[in-house]
Amino acid sequence: MRAARELLKELEYEVLSGSVDINVNDLVYNTAKITKECLFVCIKGMAFDSHEAAAKAAGAGAVVIVAERPVEVPEGITVVLVKDTRYALALISAAYFHYPARRLKVIGITGTKGKTTTAFMIRSILEHAGISTGLIGTIETIIGDRHIPADNTTPESYAIQEDFAQ
C-alpha cells in the first residue's frame, strides 16, 4: 500500500473531495484495469475521455480520482484536481515505482531519422563494455535478456517507469 499524499507530493493539486491521507493499492489509468483501492488517473484520449468514466472507476474500486476537471463520483471518494493529467500520471508513476530513473543513467535519443539504429548501436557499445543496459524503443523494450514487443510507438509514462524499475 502507498499513501496517496506521497504519490502526489511532486504535483500542484487541489483536493475537491475526500482526503489524500488515504492508502492506495495500485495506480491505474485504464478503465478496464481498475482494481480495489486504486488511485485512478483520468486521461483524455483521442477517442475516449476517462473523465466521463470516473463514477464507473469509483464503483469498480478506485478510492482516489485524479482529474483535470470536476467529476461526478459517489460520496467518500477522493477527487484531486490537476492542470494536466498526463503530466500528473508521469510524476505519480515515478513516485509509485520509487523514482527508478534516479538510480539509472538514461540516454535519450531524438530526431527525425535513425533513432532506433542509434539506440541499438549505443546498447551494443555499452554491452560490449560490460555495462548492463535496457532499451525502450518503438519496436520493443529490452530489459536484460527479455525482449518485449512494443504495444505503442510511444509508451505511457506508467509503462516507462515500470520498465525503469525492472
Question: Model-flagged regions — what are they?
Answer:
Residues 1-91:
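N-terminal leader/targeting and accessory segments in enzymes
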Residues 11, 89-166:
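Phosphate-binding loop of NTP-binding sites
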